[in-house]
């Protein structure tokens, strides 16, 4: 089905509607699973030696030093323009402001007299950030990951990226307080972060995007007892736009294309109650597509994308919630009034002047978001992902005495005798003291 095909939602059967909201299949195979498993085992067993072999095999690079030196990072900084450095500084300031505001106050309550319960937060001690290489270095992801890690108070923050690492990534790492950067990419980088090598330290949690091999490696290490936790499940990028007749077609088209250019497996969807708006957006997409350097990539993504006409805006919201997009853009009159009805989305952009690009780079929200339907259960990345919650309880003699019979009754009902005894022994001790 061509992207230019305008679909009337209410003329479709329930099965057709379901098909319209299906996402492109994620490329997985037994061969990827086996290959990644072998890489993990090899790196775990042979450490740095295995990392160098994989760099030669996959990156066609001879790596003499796995650790990037301070001199290399300083030289990278010198090669960047002041304009780019200033732009990064503005982005970091906004990310800092938004994520600092996410700090949770401690909870400290008396659930009943003499029974004190608290909730406190502690940072994840060590985190590893993975940043892909390629022709378009994702240095903005360094800002999005390293900044909240620093605010959370993570003691160890390290970064891996395939060699040669772009100057922008090295500078962003320095700007955000990353302590060590390593010349290693792919599934082998995930293995190094999960298990540790002579050069790369083992970390508690791994963050960052990657290809099918990186994604599979993260999945596997998160399921190994000696592995590491990961940020969230990964999938192709996506955006859904809700637009009414007052939206600007060129703005809508540019937002759709900014997501489509990410990759051929990206998906973009327009929902509008105005058929004429759908037609005008399709025309604007074609005009803008012709000017894009990544036009072929975007065109492939558009082949699995949709222009859907609905009954009204309420139905747009209903369909959007059913789909649960990574990015949701609402370009309608009084866009904010629709927010309360949104139940599943990674990040929401309201009005004509809130392009997805703002959140991707510099508004302050995080661009690491759940995708592929995971918005039903997962949240956008935030400060909490770099922290742990811990509860504390303290019972006075009086508080314990008042609660003891309740605990004994519940423990006996579950036939957990030792649990009951732990209370009964204390009750008897109090009686002896009386």
Swiss-Prot record:
It comes from the Bacteria. One of its GO terms (cellular component) is cytosol. The gene is hisD. Gene3D superfamilies: 1.20.5.1300, Nitrogenase molybdenum iron protein domain. One of its GO terms (molecular function) is NAD binding. It is an enzyme of class 1 (oxidoreductase). This is Histidinol dehydrogenase. It catalyses: L-histidinol + 2 NAD(+) + H2O = L-histidine + 2 NADH + 3 H(+). Catalyzes the sequential NAD-dependent oxidations of L-histidinol to L-histidinaldehyde and then to L-histidine. NCBIfam families: hisD. Pathway: Amino-acid biosynthesis; L-histidine biosynthesis; L-histidine from 5-phospho-alpha-D-ribose 1-diphosphate: step 9/9. InterPro entries: Ald_DH/histidinol_DH, Histidinol_DH_CS, Histidinol_DH_monofunct, Hstdl_DH. NAD(+) binds at residues 130, 188, 211. Keywords: Amino-acid biosynthesis, Histidine biosynthesis, Metal-binding, NAD, Oxidoreductase, Zinc. Binds 1 zinc ion per subunit. Zn(2+) binds at residues 259, 262, 360, 419. Homodimer. It comes from Shigella dysenteriae serotype 1 (strain Sd197). Its cofactor is Zn(2+). Substrate binds at residues 237, 259, 262, 327, 360, 414, 419. It holds the Pfam family Histidinol_dh. Its EC number is 1.1.1.23. SUPFAM superfamilies: ALDH-like.
């Amino acid at each position: 089905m061509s992207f230019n095909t305008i679909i009337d939602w209410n003329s479709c059967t329930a099965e057709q509607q379901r098909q319209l909201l299906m996402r492109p299949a994620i490329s997985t195979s037994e061969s990827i699973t086996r290959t990644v498993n072998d890489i993990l085992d090899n790196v775990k067993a042979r450490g740095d030696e295995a990392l160098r072999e994989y760099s030669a095999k996959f990156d066609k690079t001879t790596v003499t030093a796995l650790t990037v030196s301070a001199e290399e990072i300083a030289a990278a900084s010198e090669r960047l323009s002041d304009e780019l450095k200033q732009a990064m500084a503005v982005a970091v300031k906004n990310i800092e402001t938004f994520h600092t505001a996410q700090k949770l106050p401690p909870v400290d309550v008396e659930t009943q007299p003499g029974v004190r319960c608290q909730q406190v937060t502690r940072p994840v001690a060590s985190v590893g950030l993975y940043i892909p290489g390629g022709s378009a270095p994702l240095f903005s992801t360094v800002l999005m990951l390293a900044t909240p890690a620093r605010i959370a108070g993570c003691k160890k923050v390290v970064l891996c990226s395939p060699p040669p690492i772009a100057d922008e990534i090295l500078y962003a790492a320095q700007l955000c307080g990353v302590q060590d950067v390593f010349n290693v990419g792919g599934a082998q980088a995930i293995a190094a972060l999960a298990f540790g090598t002579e050069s790369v330290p083992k970390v508690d949690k791994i963050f960052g995007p990657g290809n099918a091999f990186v994604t599979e490696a993260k999945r596997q290490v998160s399921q190994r007892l000696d592995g590491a936790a990961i940020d969230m499940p990964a999938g192709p990028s996506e955006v859904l736009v809700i637009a009414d007749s007052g939206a600007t077609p060129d703005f809508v088209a540019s937002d759709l294309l900014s997501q489509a250019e990410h990759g051929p497996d990206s998906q973009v969807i327009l929902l509008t109650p105005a058929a004429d708006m759908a037609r005008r957006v399709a025309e604007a997409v074609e005009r803008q597509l012709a000017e894009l350097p990544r036009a072929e990539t975007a065109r492939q993504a558009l082949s699995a994308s949709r222009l859907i006409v609905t009954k009204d805006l309420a139905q747009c919201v209903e369909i959007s919630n059913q789909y649960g997009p990574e990015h949701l853009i609402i370009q309608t009159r009084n866009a904010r009034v629709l927010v309360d009805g949104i139940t599943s989305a990674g990040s929401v952009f309201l009005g004509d002047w809130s392009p997805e690009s703002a959140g991707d780079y510099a508004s302050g929200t995080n661009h690491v978001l759940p995708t592929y339907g995971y918005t039903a259960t997962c949240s956008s990345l935030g400060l909490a992902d770099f922290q742990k919650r811990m509860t504390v309880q303290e019972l006075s003699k009086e508080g314990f005495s008042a609660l003891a019979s309740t605990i004994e009754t519940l423990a006996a009902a579950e036939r957990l005798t030792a649990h009951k005894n732990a209370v009964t022994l204390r009750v008897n001790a109090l009686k002896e003291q009386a």
